[in-house]
């Protein structure tokens, strides 16, 4: 039986913390879908197509990782992809309450859907896309936190605003 997992998120932009988790998930599962949510309510800086393209570049070395965009409920997307495992990252205890609510709702919507929680490597445990964007907007050095292609894209996007 193929172990197919989905690692969902907005990935606006994809950080080294995200890359750490998808890389580790790719070692645990036969096939991993990096599922990029449209998330219009979050007002992402990058379009869905841009986020999919960047994530595809960043994960191109991971043979068992596929990058897809989606705009439906995660449980419905998982069912359409024949996946029954969700990979989620937990950076801090504060993430747990929200993730527990999501896991329970997803299980209610799709009883066979299990959530697996991974903690990022310590060096990435404080990184979030929102924090990186804020540092970039104020001229801080974000290169240590993002893949190089994402760093360049973020500076280009901010310069165009």
From Swiss-Prot:
Which residues are involved in binding ATP? 10-11, 18, 89-91, 99, 124-130
- Where is substrate bound in this sequence? 10, 42, 74, 88
Where exactly are the transmembrane stretches of this chain? none
Q: Where is this site: Transition state stabilizer?
A: 18
- Give cofactor(s), names only: Mg(2+)
Using the UniProt record, name the top-level EC class of this enzyme in a single word. Answer: transferase
Which Pfam families did the record assign? Answer: CTP_transf_like
User: Is ATP-binding included in the keywords of this UniProt record?
Assistant: yes
One GO CC annotation: cytoplasm
Keywords per UniProt: ATP-binding, Coenzyme A biosynthesis, Cytoplasm, Magnesium, Nucleotide-binding, Nucleotidyltransferase, Transferase
Q: CDD domains, alphabetically?
A: PPAT
Annotated EC: 2.7.7.3
Biological process (GO) annotations held by this record are: coenzyme A biosynthetic process
Where found, per UniProt?
Cytoplasm
GO molecular function, a single term = pantetheine-phosphate adenylyltransferase activity
Reactions catalysed according to its record: (R)-4'-phosphopantetheine + ATP + H(+) = 3'-dephospho-CoA + diphosphate
User: Where is the major localization of this protein?
Assistant: cytoplasm
What pathway or pathways are given for this protein in its record?
Cofactor biosynthesis; coenzyme A biosynthesis; CoA from (R)-pantothenate: step 4/5
Assembly information from the UniProt record = Homohexamer.
**What is this protein's function?**
Reversibly transfers an adenylyl group from ATP to 4'-phosphopantetheine, yielding dephospho-CoA (dPCoA) and pyrophosphate.
Q: Which family does it belong to?
A: Belongs to the bacterial CoaD family.
Quote the protein name from its UniProt record: Phosphopantetheine adenylyltransferase
Q: Which organism is it from?
A: Serratia proteamaculans (strain 568)
Q: What is the lineage of its organism?
A: Bacteria, Pseudomonadati, Pseudomonadota, Gammaproteobacteria, Enterobacterales
Gene encoding the protein = coaD
């Amino acid at each position: 039986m193929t172990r197919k997992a989905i690692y969902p998120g907005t990935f606006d932009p994809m950080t080294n913390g995200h890359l750490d988790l998808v890389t580790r998930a790719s070692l645990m599962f036969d096939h991993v879908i990096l599922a990029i949510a449209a998330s219009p309510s979050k007002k992402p800086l990058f379009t869905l197509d841009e986020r999919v393209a960047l994530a595809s570049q960043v994960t191109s070395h991971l043979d068992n990782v596929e990058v897809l965009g989606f705009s439906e409920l995660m449980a419905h997307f998982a069912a359409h992809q024949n996946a029954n495992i969700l990979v989620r990252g937990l950076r801090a205890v504060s993430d747990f309450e929200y993730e527990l609510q999501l896991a329970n709702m997803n299980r209610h919507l799709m009883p066979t859907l299990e959530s697996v929680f991974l903690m990022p490597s310590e060096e990435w445990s404080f990184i979030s896309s929102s924090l990186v964007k804020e540092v970039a907007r104020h001229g801080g050095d974000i290169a240590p936190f993002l893949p190089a292609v994402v760093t360049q894209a973020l500076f280009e996007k901010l310069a165009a605003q």
